[in-house]
């Protein structure tokens, strides 16, 4: 079986909030892990009311804290918006 992955933007459902979106993403990652998925990706998006994945390293930490074996990572970081050193330090801390 090929290694399957998921890309999750942590969508905020109508009438809900970012906190619930992140809980939903964690639950989805847990279901994907049980189903045998290999990787779970999140991506950075800003100024979008319907997406809760602005702080990618925080989202990764939240999801990884609720899973055991699925690999959790970033599908995209907007480097022009961040100091490369800060990105390296944040992701180094997650290892």
Model-predicted segments: where are they?
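N-terminal beta1-alpha1-beta2 module of alpha/beta enzyme domains
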Residues: 1-72
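Glycine-rich anion/phosphate-binding loops
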Residues: 20-24, 80-93
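A short, terminal or domain-edge coil/loop segment
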Residues: 59-61, 91-95
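The substrate-binding groove and active-site-proximal loops of carbohydrate-active enzymes
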Residues: 73-81
């Amino acid at each position: 079986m090929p290694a399957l992955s998921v890309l999750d933007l942590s969508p905020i459902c109508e009438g809900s909030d970012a906190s619930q979106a992140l809980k939903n993403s964690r639950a989805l990652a847990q279901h994907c892990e049980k189903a045998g998925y290999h990787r779970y990706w999140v991506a950075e998006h800003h100024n979008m009311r319907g997406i809760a994945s602005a702080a990618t390293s925080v989202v990764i930490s939240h999801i990884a804290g609720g899973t055991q074996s699925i690999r959790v990572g970033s599908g995209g970081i907007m480097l022009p918006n961040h100091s490369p050193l800060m990105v390296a330090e944040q992701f180094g801390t997650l290892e």
